[in-house]
């Protein structure tokens, strides 16, 4: 699962565009696998960055917040990246359109992140852009919140899935076959044991 947040300004003080990739396990833990931040106004760069992350992690869904001009970018991504040469879906796009009833951006981030961090259900990798995310998480009013916002979008996605609990020796063979069928349908990530 991934989420993508768009920013249109190249100004140093403005937020950056961001992609966050997460994985999950059967205990409902969330693993931040990768983060990329960049500034651009070019639609082709949005596509290139997402294609690079998809190639690296092979996630099935990307959640994109769609407001104003972002709709055009998401449609471009759907046309260019979402299908292979045979027209089969390679990457599914979830359009997120926050409304008044969803609360402010800060309320949405708090609702998605605070309970999971309080329950110690979110794990970070070391180094790289994770330090930027961690700074945004601990500051009350960070100068930028693009990584935090994108992580909240991924975690609160309606497309986020958790794998089934591993089978024990006592459980019957039918449930083992069902687990094997489900496992084949999802991209496994060996380092963390969940799927993307």
What are these regions (language model features)?
Residues 105-119, 137-141:
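Short, surface-exposed amphipathic charged segments that create phosphate/polyanion-binding patches used
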Residues 99-100, 108-111, 119, 184, ...:
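Sequence-pattern detector for short linear motifs
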Residues 85-109:
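Conserved phosphate-binding/catalytic loops in two-lobed NTP-binding clefts
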Residues 1-94, 122-196:
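RNase H-like, metal-dependent nuclease domains and their acidic two-metal-ion catalytic environment used
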């Amino acid at each position: 699962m991934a989420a993508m947040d768009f920013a249109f300004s190249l100004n140093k003080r403005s937020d950056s565009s961001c992609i966050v990739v997460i994985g999950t396990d059967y205990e409902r833990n969330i693993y931040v696998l990768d983060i990329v931040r960049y500034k651009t106004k070019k639609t082709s760069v949005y596509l290139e960055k997402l294609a690079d992350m998809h190639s690296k992690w092979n996630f099935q869904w990307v959640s994109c917040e769609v407001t104003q001009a972002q709709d055009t970018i998401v449609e471009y991504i759907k046309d260019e990246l979402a299908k292979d040469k045979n027209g089969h879906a390679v990457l599914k796009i979830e359009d997120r359109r926050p409304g008044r009833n969803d609360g402010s951006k800060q309320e949405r981030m708090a609702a998605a992140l605070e309970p999971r961090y309080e329950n110690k259900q979110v794990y970070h990798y070391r180094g790289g852009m994770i330090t930027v995310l961690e700074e945004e998480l601990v500051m009350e009013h960070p100068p930028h919140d693009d990584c935090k916002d994108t992580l909240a979008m991924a975690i609160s996605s309606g497309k986020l899935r958790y794998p089934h609990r591993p089978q024990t020796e006592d459980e019957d063979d039918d449930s083992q076959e069902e687990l094997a069928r489900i496992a084949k349908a999802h991209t496994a990530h060996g380092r963390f044991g969940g799927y993307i």
